[in-house]
Amino acid sequence: MTNYREIAWQGLWKNNPGLVQLLGLCPLLAVTATITNALGLGVATMLVLIGSNILVSLVRDYVPKEIRIPVFVMIIAALVTTVQLLINAYAYGLYLSLGIFLPLIVTNCIIIGRAEAFASRNNAFSAAFDGLMMGLGFTLVLAVLGATRELLGQGTLFDGADQLLGPWAKSLTIHVWQVDTPFLLAMLPPGAFIVMGLLIALKNVIDKKLKEHQPQVATEPSVTRARITKVS
């Protein structure tokens, strides 16, 4: 029986694609200058993850093991192309902001990794839930990273939200403080490396605290057995 709580825990925290597996670092560090770009890339990746997991699970019994990886990549590429065309049609500003990193979702190790490790061995519903949790965990990391960098670099949050949600979302921009000159370190990839390292360190500290508060399981002391031989 599938343990959906464990799947959710693995995707959102314990085995988070961004903080633990450190997959998809190239787009994660490159396009998270704002929370809008981060959410756009995260949602696109999550949709591809869910779709690819479902399709891989459905065809797993019909694809020979020798050619399964090329078939999985073709499925992923078709889904990425579909998502790319949809974003181009309905969120053109976001499409321009994400640039080359949108089609590069095809090569994201998160997607092919879940297809091989989970979707190809489980039913479609479990695979879809795994894709949702892994995609959501990745999106949360992107959002936190994007929000932190945008706040430090520009003093705003949700700047350019209209690119993702439409013209009505211009009012969502929050000016936290006035910045005369953008803090370039936070806006450039080196700043993303620093913030990402701090997020990983924070997760490790939280994991350590959680482990310390877990009840210790008492173990019985080991008993050494001695063989006694009768001496005549």
From Swiss-Prot:
Keyword list, A-Z: Cell inner membrane, Cell membrane, Electron transport, Membrane, Translocase, Transmembrane, Transmembrane helix, Transport
Entry's transmembrane regions: 18-38, 39-59, 69-89, 93-113, 127-147, 182-202
Pfam family, one: Rnf-Nqr
Major enzyme class: translocase
Function summary: Part of a membrane-bound complex that couples electron transfer with translocation of ions across the membrane.
Top-level taxon of origin: Bacteria
Cellular compartments annotated: Cell inner membrane
Subunit note: The complex is composed of six subunits: RnfA, RnfB, RnfC, RnfD, RnfE and RnfG.
GO biological process terms, semicolon-separated: electron transport chain
Name of protein: Ion-translocating oxidoreductase complex subunit E
Membrane topology per record: Multi-pass membrane protein
Keyword Coiled coil attached: no
InterPro entries assigned: NqrDE/RnfAE, RnfE
GO cellular component, one term: plasma membrane
Family per similarity comment: Belongs to the NqrDE/RnfAE family.
